[in-house]
A protein has these predicted regions:
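A binding-site-centric feature that preferentially detects glycan-recognition modules on secreted/surface proteins
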Residues: 1-112, 118-189
């Protein structure tokens, strides 16, 4: 995986994570086959997750975020946590030519849409460890929903790296919107 692999030591160093014996045992085996890792080596990032919410990541690395504003009060930022497991998340994205529903319908049985906390965890780790941006200004839709402001339904959460503000920011993308989007994609394990 080369530069697209992060290990336990990277997570310990950059997040202050303590895995303990059970955590190390859980992460001892990478659940993806060698063939999958070879096929994904230029398009995905492999990393171990550690149980943190976006608000907890913000507390550890505030300079990397644009101000959270009201997002800190939404459940996607406050309650959702990264799982203690291996992740293989796509770092290259398909062109934004289809709607969320159209792209979601095309996911293979081995793919899923990750949560915003998982995307943020990966983006922060990539920046702190290698000074590499993952999203480069794109709005990447995640699996989380948040209550819309002007729209009565739930909206998809998007994550982006705001290059002007040098930080990670969030927003709402209405389910009523039919414009093309960039969908975050992860391999299931």
């Amino acid at each position: 995986m080369g530069n697209h692999f992060f290990g336990l030591e990277d997570v310990r160093h950059h997040y202050g994570a303590f895995f303990g014996g059970e955590g190390v045992a859980l992460l001892e085996h990478v659940p993806f086959s060698e063939a999958t890792l070879r096929a994904c080596r230029t398009t995905h990032i492999l990393f171990p997750g550690y149980p943190l919410s976006i608000t907890e990541m913000y507390a550890k690395c505030p300079k990397i975020f644009s101000p959270l504003g009201n997002a800190q009060f939404d459940s996607f930022a406050r309650d959702e946590r990264v799982d203690l497991r291996w992740y293989l998340i796509r770092r290259t994205y398909r062109p934004a030519t289809q709607t969320f529903a159209e792209q979601h319908a095309q996911l293979s049985c081995h793919e899923e849409v990750p949560l915003a906390c998982e995307m943020v965890f990966m983006a922060i780790l990539s920046w702190l460890a290698r000074k590499q941006r993952v999203f480069r200004g794109m709005r990447v839709l995640c699996d989380d929903l948040m209550r819309g402001i002007s729209d009565p339904g739930d909206c998809r959460v998007f994550v982006q790296e705001d290059e002007r503000k040098q930080g990670i920011s969030f927003g709402r993308f209405s389910h009523l919107c039919n414009e093309p989007v960039v969908l975050a994609i992860a391999r299931k394990n």
